[in-house]
């Protein structure tokens, strides 16, 4: 799929959104469950980027995420890339604040599992549960409220 396309396969609806790097991001809806996977859609605020490029990265990330406003997202997989150093949390914070998924699952953190603990400690709420991942192969159970 390319950006901004929709596909329906029996009871599964897939909508594609843009990325700020490679590929696309996806919203999958089935059986009254909605799952968003950001892929490489991230707020890439690299220290080596000048201010103009950093502002563009912010604008492009927010533009794609804002397309999800008004949609109920049950589960969201969003990058929290520690290579961005002190800016690693920006994409996740914006997504949680603006979209308010029921469950937020951090991705793109390699083996830096402390990042997931940081997110849980900082952003877990009655509105959005944040998954803390302790190691590879961990299972996360989602139940509706």
Regions inferred by a protein language model and the residue ranges of each:
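Core dinuclear metal-dependent hydrolase active-site scaffold
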Residues: 1-72, 135-145
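Catalytic metal-binding/acid-base residues of hydrolase active sites
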Residues: 42, 79-83, 108-110
């Amino acid at each position: 799929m390319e950006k901004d396309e929709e596909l329906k396969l029996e009871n599964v609806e897939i909508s594609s959104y843009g990325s700020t790097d490679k590929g696309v991001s996806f919203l999958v809806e089935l059986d009254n469950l909605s799952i968003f996977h950001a892929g490489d859609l991230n707020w890439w605020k690299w220290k080596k980027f000048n201010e103009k490029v950093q502002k563009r990265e912010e604008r492009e990330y927010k533009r794609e995420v804002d397309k999800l406003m008004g949609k109920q997202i049950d589960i969201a997989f969003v990058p929290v890339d520690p290579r961005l150093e002190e800016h690693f949390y920006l994409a996740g914070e914006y997504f949680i604040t603006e979209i308010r998924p029921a469950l937020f699952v951090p991705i793109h953190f390699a083996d830096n599992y402390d990042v997931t603990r940081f997110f849980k400690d900082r952003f877990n709420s009655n509105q959005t549960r944040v998954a803390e991942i302790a190691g590879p192969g961990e299972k996360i159970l989602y139940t509706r409220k």
